[in-house]
């Protein structure tokens, strides 16, 4: 029986445009789905817009339109952008649908019947001007732990502390600017902690990548809190069935959108919903997500499914973040690039599909879009290697042989090598290691180009006695080109379609790797792909800079990046003097940054693994994400405070503090206002700084 797979990508929020960072996931998923379909798998790709929440409601109010009108407009924009990058959803829906309401309500009622829903009265902050309870992210104030200003209502991006919004000092509503008041409200909680035994087993069953499974152990060690799944009116979403005036929190009904999208698709195509989503379904369910939403997909979602009587995910594949030129995407640098602005500049979407594929390796590592490398790699690989094979040989078929390939091939061994690579390349695609797949394919392209260079068809064409040889050489070259096209088709579907029309062949499937391409009339060759002009990339960056609207300068107290380290241990004003004995208490050590990575759910922090010599490895959270890409830090030496008391943070234990210099005005002229300290050459990990 052939495989049956239901594949999803995370649902983009209907409150903004698709940008190049989003596209990493959708391109990654689309390549995998296209590969599966080429292999003959019954594979369906579902997605939808995530449409509920306070942010949607407030934006619609600001634009003086209904939330429904807003999400319909954004849905049209998203579907247009996805189509522009050849993302081949089988169905793209909306979480604001009858199907989603039905399935979210059924899941909730099943969890309630299972004793996993409890009701508690909690104190919340309430905006007396807008008459609404404020979500955590719509409250700003001073961190109750370190005193940093302008922090969100749930966690501090300076010291990493987590807290209740009611603990925030001097809170202000981000909606109206009013001072919130305390107000009690009944809320509904999913008892996630009661599901821990199941989740511990499920997360170590091979469903997650190894690095994701390891992350789960950290969260288990910290303890699983019950999950608030309700919000008070006014709220744009679905009302809880037995709780008037209470609405499902957006993160409850968002993943249910996967089910709802398929439910509508199944209805339209006569499919059995339970055969795909039922408890005993044999269908593979595969979720592609960003690593920032791993908590929801590896804990909340499987627990919801398990205890509501549904099947569980077969696999949850998380990918890393995108940086551009080694740094976080930036509007001021013109590297916060939307999908539409890329397309509006006339850039080929398959250039980006290829480049992302060349970087994606199936892990949670971040990938970098280096714009200079982007130009060089696409021009070299796709035009200089792949397209070059056809452009140097196809013309002779029409000029000399009436557009028909030879009856046989003279180098069956070389073609056999290309055919034999099909299984290896397929294994790389299956494992989502597209980088390895493309390296294999480009190595074959090099072999094909060497064959053409050795045979010199342009020289053979001058010799009437070599006409038979010319025919065979060009036929062999086009056989190799056809096989390369087949292998690249999941990544370059539009280009593959153009090649299929040029070669006058049916749509390529994976089994076609076994066949020869002879005695076939082909169409006249026309140019298949142009090189990237570096000026077009510069124009895109400039266009994204020019599209910026002026924004107010941030409050001077904000500068979380510059305060990130000092705020962890501030005990006295900076003007106070200390004795040499006080200073001697601080154990400063040289440390080598062995690893650096983004922290899920934190906008400013990086997780650093430090080698401190005889003191061993240390984990430190540093608020330097705005200034450094993780990969730029690995291997560097820096200075750390080694005897700072360990601090339990939301994301794990921080075992010290690295030192950094800061610009008192934050960023100036787009130069990061934060600089980690590095010792002179000769310093080694563990050495004391005196």
From Swiss-Prot:
Keyword set includes Signal: no
Annotated residues for binding of ATP: 331
Keyword flag Iron-sulfur: no
Cofactors named for this entry: Zn(2+)
Motif placement: 'KMSKS' region: 328-332
GO cellular component, one term: cytosol
Domain tRNA-binding, first and last residues per copy: 582-690
PANTHER family, per the entry: METHIONINE--TRNA LIGASE, METHIONINE--TRNA LIGASE, CYTOPLASMIC
Classification via NCBIfam families: metG, metG_C_term, PRK00133.1
Record-given protein name: Methionine--tRNA ligase
Species of provenance: Thiobacillus denitrificans (strain ATCC 25259 / T1)
């Amino acid at each position: 029986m052939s495989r049956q797979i239901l594949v999803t990508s995370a649902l983009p929020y209907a409150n903004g445009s698709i940008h190049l960072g989003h596209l990493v996931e959708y391109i990654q998923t689309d390549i995998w789905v296209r590969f599966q379909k080429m292999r003959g798998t019954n594979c369906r790709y579902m997605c939808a817009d995530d449409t509920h929440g306070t942010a949607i409601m407030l934006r619609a109010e600001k634009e003086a339109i209904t939330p429904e009108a807003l999400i319909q407009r954004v849905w049209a924009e998203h579907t247009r952008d996805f189509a522009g990058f050849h993302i081949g959803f089988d169905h793209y829906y909306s979480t604001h649908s009858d199907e989603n309401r039905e399935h979210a309500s059924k899941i909730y009622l099943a969890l309630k019947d299972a004793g996993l829903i409890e009701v508690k009265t909690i104190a919340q902050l309430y905006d007396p001007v807008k008459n609404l309870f404020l979500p955590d992210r719509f409250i700003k104030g001073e961190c109750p732990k370190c005193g940093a200003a302008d922090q969100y209502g749930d966690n501090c991006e300076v010291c990493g502390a987590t807290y209740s919004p009611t603990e925030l000092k001097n809170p202000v509503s981000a909606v109206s600017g009013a001072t919130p008041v305390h107000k009690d409200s009944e809320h509904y909680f999913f008892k996630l902690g009661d599901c821990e035994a199941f989740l511990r087993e499920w997360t170590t069953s091979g469903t997650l990548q190894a690095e994701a499974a390891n992350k789960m152990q950290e969260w288990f060690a910290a303890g699983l809190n019950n999950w608030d799944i309700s919000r008070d009116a006014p709220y744009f979403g679905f009302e809880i069935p037995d709780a008037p005036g209470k609405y499902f929190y957006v993160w409850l009904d968002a993943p249910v959108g996967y089910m709802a999208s398929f439910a509508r698709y199944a209805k339209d195509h006569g499919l059995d919903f339970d055969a795909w989503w039922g408890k005993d379904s044999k269908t593979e369910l595969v979720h592609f997500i960003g690593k920032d939403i791993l908590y929801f997909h590896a804990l909340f979602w499987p627990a919801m499914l398990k205890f509501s009587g549904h099947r569980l995910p077969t696999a949850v594949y998380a990918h890393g973040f995108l940086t551009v030129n080694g740094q976080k995407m930036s509007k001021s640098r013109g590297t916060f690039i939307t999908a539409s602005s890329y397309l509006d500049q006339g850039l080929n979407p398959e250039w980006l599909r290829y480049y992302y594929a060349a970087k994606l390796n199936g892990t949670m590592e971040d990938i970098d879009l280096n714009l200079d490398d982007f130009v060089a790699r696409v021009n070299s690989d796709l035009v200089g290697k792949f397209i070059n094979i056809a452009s140097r040989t196809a013309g002779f078929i029409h000029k000399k042989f009436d557009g028909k390939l030879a009856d046989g091939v003279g180098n069956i061994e070389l073609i056999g090598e290309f055919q034999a690579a099909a299984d290896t390349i397929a294994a790389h695609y299956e494992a989502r290691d597209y980088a390895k797949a493309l390296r294999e394919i480009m190595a074959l392209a090099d072999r094909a180009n060497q064959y053409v260079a050795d045979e010199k068809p342009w020289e053979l064409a001058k010799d009437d006695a070599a006409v038979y040889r010319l025919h065979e050489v060009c036929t062999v070259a086009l056989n190799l080109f056809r096989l390369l096209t087949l292998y690249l088709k999941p990544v370059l579907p539009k280009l593959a379609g153009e090649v299929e029309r040029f070669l006058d062949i049916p749509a390529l499937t994976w089994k076609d790797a076994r066949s020869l391409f002879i005695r076939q009339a082909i169409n006249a060759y026309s140019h298949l792909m142009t090189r990237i002009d570096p000026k077009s990339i510069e124009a895109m960056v400039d266009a994204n800079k020019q599209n910026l609207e002026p924004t107010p300068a941030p409050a001077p107290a904000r500068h979380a990046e510059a305060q990130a380290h000092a705020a962890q241990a501030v005990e006295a004003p900076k003007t106070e003097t200390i004795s040499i004995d006080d200073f001697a208490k601080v154990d400063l050590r040289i440390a080598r940054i062995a690893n650096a990575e983004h922290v899920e759910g934190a906008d400013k922090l990086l997780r650093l693994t430090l080698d401190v010599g005889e003191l061993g490895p240390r984990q430190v959270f540093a608020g330097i994400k705005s200034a450094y890409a993780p990969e730029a830090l690995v291997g560097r030496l820096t200075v750390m405070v080694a005897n700072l008391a360990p601090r339990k943070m939301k994301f794990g234990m921080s075992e010290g503090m690295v030192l950094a210099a800061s610009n008192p005005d934050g960023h100036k002229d787009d130069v990061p206002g934060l600089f980690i300290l590095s010792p002179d050459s000769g310093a080694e990990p563990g050495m004391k700084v005196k």
